[in-house]
Amino acid sequence: VTSTTHKTLAGPRAGFILCREEHAQAVDKAVFPGMQGGPLLHVIAAKATCFKIAASAAFRVYQEQIRANADALADALQEGGLDLLSGGTDNHLMQVDLRRSDWTGRAAEERLHEVKITVNRNTVPFDERPPMEASGIRLGTPAVTMRGFDEGDLREVGALITGALGEGELDALRARADALCEKRPLYPGYRGYPEYR
């Protein structure tokens, strides 16, 4: 099993490999020293903190909310007329297939940036466009969930996306995005130090 420690684990930028003991020596030999340099103690400490938080009940609630938010966003996008690869999502990610529209992934990414929504262009299976243009956009829900967004908020995000890629008025959509972010500030109640126990 391979994974990153950033993204859904919300830790430092790194990765890890889990394997059975019988494969450990081969994995270690393949990774170090050729692919991995010396250990960075601050990154090791950050990983330890990330794994400690991931073992908590609160983190499980966070992960469940990520999934619920992903379903809400996927539903809103599809209800707004956008096509999703695989017809929805079964994790925290989804990819909008723009081939039936006039949008390229790049143009959609730029348009959504105008209404303060960050996505990234992505190729879709059998994409005829080059990767820098692409025919899709990829979205995920961990960051907004960490910020406190719930299913209702993600339905609004879906409406903002479909509006921006449709006939929506950009100034009005931008104002709605601002209102949503004001409702869910980045660091509500932050006192200048973390509280992990």
Where are these regions (language model features)?
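Solvent-exposed alpha-helical segments within well-ordered globular domains of core cellular machineries
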Residues: 25, 75, 110-113, 159, ...
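Short, basic, helix/turn surface patches
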Residues: 1, 5-11, 110-118, 144-159
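Conserved PLP-binding catalytic core of the aspartate aminotransferase-like
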Residues: 83-148, 194-197
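Intrinsically disordered or highly flexible coil/loop and linker segments, enriched in small
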Residues: 36, 40, 60, 79, ...
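Generic non-transmembrane alpha-helical segments
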Residues: 72, 76-80, 107-115, 164
